[in-house]
């Protein structure tokens, strides 16, 4: 029995490694569409739970941890862009405005599930079209919710952060440190 991270996110992997956990990664392949028109928190938890349960079905003796991150902009759920053109539109829409980054974590083990989430508000600077274009050409924007990686964007796009920085990275670290998930993983 061990820990499996059901994620392909290098950022989640690094945070878990930095916390001292030994685990293996398995990338789940699930449908992330929002067919049920869920609100942003319910949606991110459903996707996180789906990833964990999908992997757990094949590794029932393991503790499977998964996560998901989305952007909530005035009730609109924004995930990963499918093209640089879509990434441009997303960043342009967020320019000079505040949005919420919501990350969820789910742990599946012994036919049980635990989920947590956190929300961080991020305000973008007023961005010119050329700054957005240069950002998209300089960084990989297609595998990040909202078309940006906080580690690349902080000095370019971001005006203000209110909440947990690591939540923007994709791991609600403050909530995790106080959660039953951490207690369970620490006792394996």
Segments from the language model and where they lie:
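Anionic-ligand binding patches
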Residues: 3, 17, 39-188
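Short glycine-rich, Thr/Ser-proximal phosphate-binding strand/loop in the N-terminal lobe
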Residues: 20-35, 113-115, 119
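N-terminal beta1-alpha1 ligand-phosphate binding loop
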Residues: 2-21, 27
């Amino acid at each position: 029995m061990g820990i499996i991270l059901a994620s392909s996110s290098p950022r989640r992997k690094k945070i878990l490694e930095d916390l001292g956990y030994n685990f293996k990664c398995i990338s789940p392949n699930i449908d992330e569409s929002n067919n049920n028109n869920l609100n942003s928190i319910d949606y991110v938890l459903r996707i996180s739970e789906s990833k964990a349960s999908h992997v757990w079905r094949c590794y029932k003796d393991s503790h499977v941890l998964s996560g998901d991150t989305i952007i909530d902009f005035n009730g609109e759920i924004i995930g990963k862009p499918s093209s640089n053109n879509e990434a441009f539109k997303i960043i342009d829409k967020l320019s000079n405005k505040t949005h919420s980054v919501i990350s969820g974590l789910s742990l599946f083990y012994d036919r049980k599930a635990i989920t947590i989430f956190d929300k961080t508000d991020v305000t973008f600077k007023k961005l010119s079209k050329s700054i957005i274009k240069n950002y998209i050409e300089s960084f990989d924007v297609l595998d990040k919710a909202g078309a940006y990686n906080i580690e690349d964007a902080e000095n370019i796009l971001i005006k203000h952060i209110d909440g947990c920085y690591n939540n923007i990275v994709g791991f609600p670290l403050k909530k995790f440190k106080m959660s039953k998930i951490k207690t369970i993983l620490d006792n394996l």
